[in-house]
């Protein structure tokens, strides 16, 4: 087993492993753990009481964080004619159709989010095996398959976070930067959790959020009060 670095061990001294933190305490504490030479991402990790191998227990969606993510997002749009013009006017970084699909097939993926109009999803399907594993395949559930291109581009640029439960029932997401104010991080966190709660499957029995933790890119994690998370509606 790899040993923790001296820096990480120093951070561990600031964290009480036996403590369950409320949101305010967790955000206050996690901001004291910044030690990297870059603006670390504040990360939320959740363990949900779902079994995603069943389609009716898949938790997937998107949410626009009020303070954004602190990350510059490059947006590509697959559209034609008037919708292509709409994408350009909305501020999309890359706009195209067949030629953009060809670039993706070559491995030239110079974007973070891909949006497509519904009528071109047959075209997008040609590169599904490339986009799927990278988590950037357009999907109606994340509002990336839409005719409302202007709003989709705006949301992607302003801090939309897509989430999807993995095979073990976990959801991990970046909800801002450690340089954000405490209030900004708290608002982003509560907005994210509220959206997760809205997506609770009707077939999920028992305690929906089994555990939660807050951390930075390079820090130990803090255990969150799951009851407080569940109460966010």
UniProtKB/Swiss-Prot annotation:
SUPFAM superfamilies: Ribosomal protein L1. This is Large ribosomal subunit protein uL1. Binds directly to 23S rRNA. The L1 stalk is quite mobile in the ribosome, and is involved in E site tRNA release. Protein L1 is also a translational repressor protein, it controls the translation of the L11 operon by binding to its mRNA. Keywords: Repressor, Ribonucleoprotein, Ribosomal protein, RNA-binding, rRNA-binding, Translation regulation, tRNA-binding. InterPro entries: Ribosom_uL1_bac-type (IPR005878), Ribosomal_uL1 (IPR002143), Ribosomal_uL1-like (IPR023674), Ribosomal_uL1/biogenesis (IPR028364), Ribosomal_uL1_3-a/b-sand (IPR016095), Ribosomal_uL1_CS (IPR023673). One of its GO terms (cellular component) is cytosolic large ribosomal subunit. The gene is rplA. One of its GO terms (molecular function) is rRNA binding. NCBIfam families: rplA_bact. It comes from Campylobacter hominis (strain ATCC BAA-381 / DSM 21671 / CCUG 45161 / LMG 19568 / NCTC 13146 / CH001A). Transmembrane segments: none annotated. GO terms for biological process: regulation of translation; translation. Part of the 50S ribosomal subunit. Belongs to the universal ribosomal protein uL1 family. PANTHER family: 54S RIBOSOMAL PROTEIN L1, MITOCHONDRIAL (PTHR36427), LARGE RIBOSOMAL SUBUNIT PROTEIN UL1M (PTHR36427:SF3).
